[in-house]
């Protein structure tokens, strides 16, 4: 059979069947001309690795797929049974007739962005159910003579902690568990440089991400005899799933993109793809948001909130977001011990309800938003008292609470209907609500669903994610004009699967500016700034001018009490908002250029990044001084996108004063000398606005 080649921009993956019909992978992504690759030479297909190795097919290749058949069979020998292509959609069918099993390897190419999506769909026609134990979304092999892996592990308030190291011989694993907040343990994103560490502008590098809202396992495997071959197995976990005849099981999707010239061009491709194919309304500007949580926690009433609205409007914000604590009648939400599940406004705190609050926001020139946690319930609630069987629990075990709450069982259709109906009713009762923050603050600990029979309890981990996604689909469909923020104790759901129903994600509950700068830097390899919500807070008593400057390089907002601001702090916050509104189109829709990375050798505590508009005629550059620097040594910030034939007007601003330094420079001198670095003091910032229009 002729080889199958599926292109994604400058890159491609190719397959061919061997003489036994087993599908082999011939190549995965390009190498520079003249570089060796494992598929060079006049070799037969048998010399190449299996494209999707199954259990019992080849013991030397760890399986991407494993099942136990209805009759107890475990060996699987799938052979090529067909190939279909329609536009950019490709389907390669593998079949094992003895098992009455089909495995469709599905690929979707995005040539304009150079992105490839890959997943598998499994079905069978046996006499009864089978158990799928492992089903990878993808298991490609690539030529990687000197592979270096960048991974992003985490914890609460420590998401996106990056580490880069060579991939040793053996198996390296990135994994997370759970079905609610898996990204608190490890991010499903990674970078793999194939020929030593990649730079921003040099070196072949692959980016990958499993688009899944539950636990995942990414394995990077090198063998002693063929260390230049690297197999990446990408899948969800726990993966055990009881599958009935004629039912199609689809794995999560794996997202790939490739750059031969470093991480910068890779980032641009992913950002354009995320805006165009993942997040909602990817070409729309996001508002400046004022959130109440760190200003009030549970201590507020209507009068206090209205005073805060006046202060929020004075800072120049556009959206007022009321966080946790607004609901509960019989069990009012005065702390985290009661009220979850009873989504009616607390009449003691909000006698006019949500409509009165929305009207107050509108009078202050603000739109109004609301926090919800619809997947959770407190035992101290009307909902739990009425439906104690609606929670995820294993019979015979105590129901352990986290944050005094339990997880609703979304596998029950009536629970899904409750979640969708709750959000719909809130929006119907207060038509002025324009924004929802969807949160989730605990994991599943006693996995059990009353909706699943005893022999299907293992399906809970997968079915919970799919049920949640169905609820999110319904909510997004019934509220197309409502902006949605994705949150899960911070960045517990920062995945490309769940983001499809949301406009932005809360990256972390950690809002220390220096820590957030590093988190935002690492996340920026994959997510555009408009998707990363960043708020100015008083975390650790930090300097607010510096905190503003860090938040301005993402989707800018505040989470503090305006009444607590000193005159100098208020001036800095107002100036930050004004500057952000001027450059917001660049930050949210422009091309990101990472210039000086955090903690780079020789950086002397400097960090810098910029955003460019069309043809690089307009740009904004943010410079940060994380640690004190000696003023005796000159330093600069590179401007690699400058056009040597243009002349730029440059405005240099800080948030601690109301003036600006204005100069003019030709592009040639900017390319050669960069921008003079003015900062020496710890936790200070500078903003440059460049305009050649």
Question: Which residue stretches match the model-derived regions?
Answer:
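Polysaccharide-binding surfaces and accessory modules of carbohydrate-active proteins
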Residues: 2-6, 11-17, 23-223, 237, ...
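Carbohydrate-binding surface patches
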Residues: 10, 190-192, 200, 600-644, ...
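Glycine-rich, aromatic-flanked loop segments that form ligand/cofactor-binding clefts
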Residues: 46-76, 202-219, 256-279, 317-324, ...
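Short Pro-Gly-centered flexible turn/kink motifs
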Residues: 78, 241-260, 683-690
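Active-site and adjacent substrate-binding regions of carbohydrate-active enzymes
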Residues: 120-122, 297, 328, 346, ...
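Aromatic-lined carbohydrate-binding/catalytic grooves of carbohydrate-active enzymes
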Residues: 281-421, 430-431, 435
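Glycan-recognition surfaces
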Residues: 378, 384-417, 462-563
């Amino acid at each position: 059979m002729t080889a199958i080649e599926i292109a994604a921009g400058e890159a491609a993956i190719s397959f061919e069947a061997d003489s036994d019909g087993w599908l082999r992978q011939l190549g995965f992504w390009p190498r520079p001309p003249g570089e060796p690759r494992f598929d060079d030479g006049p070799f037969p297909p048998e010399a190449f690795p299996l494209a999707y190795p199954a259990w019992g097919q080849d013991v030397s290749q760890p399986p991407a797929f494993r099942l136990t058949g209805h009759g107890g069979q475990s060996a699987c020998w799938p052979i090529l049974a067909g190939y279909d292509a329609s536009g950019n959609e490709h389907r390669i069918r593998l079949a094992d007739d003895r098992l009455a099993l089909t495995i469709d390897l599905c690929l979707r190419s995005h040539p304009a962005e150079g992105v490839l999506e890959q997943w598998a769909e499994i079905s069978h026609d046996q006499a009864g159910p089978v158990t799928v134990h492992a089903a990878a979304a993808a298991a490609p092999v690539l030529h990687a003579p000197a592979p270096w892996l960048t991974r992003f592990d985490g914890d609460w308030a420590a998401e996106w902690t990056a580490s880069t190291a060579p991939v040793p011989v053996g198996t390296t694993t990135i994994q997370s568990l759970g079905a609610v907040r898996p990204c608190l343990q490890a991010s499903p994103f990674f970078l793999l440089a194939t020929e030593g560490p990649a730079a921003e502008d040099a070196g072949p590098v692959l980016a990958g991400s499993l688009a899944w809202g539950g636990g995942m396992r990414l394995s990077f495997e090198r063998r002693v005899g063929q260390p230049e071959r690297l197999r990446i197995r990408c899948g969800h976990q726990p993966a055990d799933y009881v599958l009935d005849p004629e039912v199609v099981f689809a794995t999560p999707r794996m997202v790939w993109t490739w750059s031969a010239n470093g991480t910068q061009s890779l980032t641009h491709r992913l950002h354009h793809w995320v805006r165009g194919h993942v997040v909602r309304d990817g070409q729309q500007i996001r508002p400046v948001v004022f959130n109440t949580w760190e200003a009030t926690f549970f201590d507020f009433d209507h009068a206090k909130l209205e005073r805060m609205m006046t202060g929020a409007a004075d800072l120049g914000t556009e959206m007022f977001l009321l966080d946790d604590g607004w609901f509960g009648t019989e069990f009012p939400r005065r702390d985290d011990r009661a009220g979850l599940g009873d989504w009616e406004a607390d009449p003691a705190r909000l006698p006019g309800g949500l409509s009165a609050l929305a009207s107050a926001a509108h009078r202050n020139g603000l739109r109004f938003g609301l926090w919800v946690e619809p997947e959770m319930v407190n035992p101290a609630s009307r909902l739990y008292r009425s439906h104690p069987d609606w929670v995820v629990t294993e019979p015979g075990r105590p129901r352990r609470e986290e944050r005094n709450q339990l997880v609703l069982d979304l596998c029950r259709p009536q629970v899904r209907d409750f979640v969708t109906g709750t959000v719909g009713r809130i929006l119907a009762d207060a038509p002025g609500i324009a924004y929802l923050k969807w949160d989730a603050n605990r994991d599943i600990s006693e996995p059990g669903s009353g909706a699943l029979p005893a022999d299907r309890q293992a399906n809970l981990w997968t079915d919970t994610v799919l049920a949640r996604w169905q609820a999110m689909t319904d909510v997004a469909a019934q509220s197309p004009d409502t902006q949605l923020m994705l949150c899960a104790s911070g960045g517990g759901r920062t995945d490309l699967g769940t983001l499809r129903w949301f406009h932005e994600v809360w990256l972390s509950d950690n809002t220390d500016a220096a820590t957030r700068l590093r988190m935002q830097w690492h996340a920026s390899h994959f997510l555009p700034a408009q998707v990363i919500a960043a708020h100015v807070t008083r975390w650790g008593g930090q300097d607010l001018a510096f905190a503003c400057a860090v938040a301005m390089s993402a989707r800018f907002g505040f989470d503090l009490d305006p009444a607590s601001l000193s005159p100098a702090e208020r001036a800095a916050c107002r100036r930050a908002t004004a500057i952000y509104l001027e450059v917001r189109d660049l930050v949210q829709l422009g091309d990101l250029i990472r210039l000086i990375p955090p903690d780079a050798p020789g950086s002397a505590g400097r960090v810098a990044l910029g955003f460019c508009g069309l043809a690089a005629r307009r740009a904004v550059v943010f410079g940060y001084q994380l640690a004190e620097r000696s003023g005796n040594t000159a330093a600069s910030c590179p401007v690699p996108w400058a056009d040597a034939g243009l002349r730029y007007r440059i405005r240099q601003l800080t948030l601690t004063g109301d003036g600006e330094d204005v100069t003019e420079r030709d592009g040639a001198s900017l390319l050669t000398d960069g921008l003079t670095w003015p900062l020496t003091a710890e936790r200070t910032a500078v903003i440059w606005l460049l305009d050649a229009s």
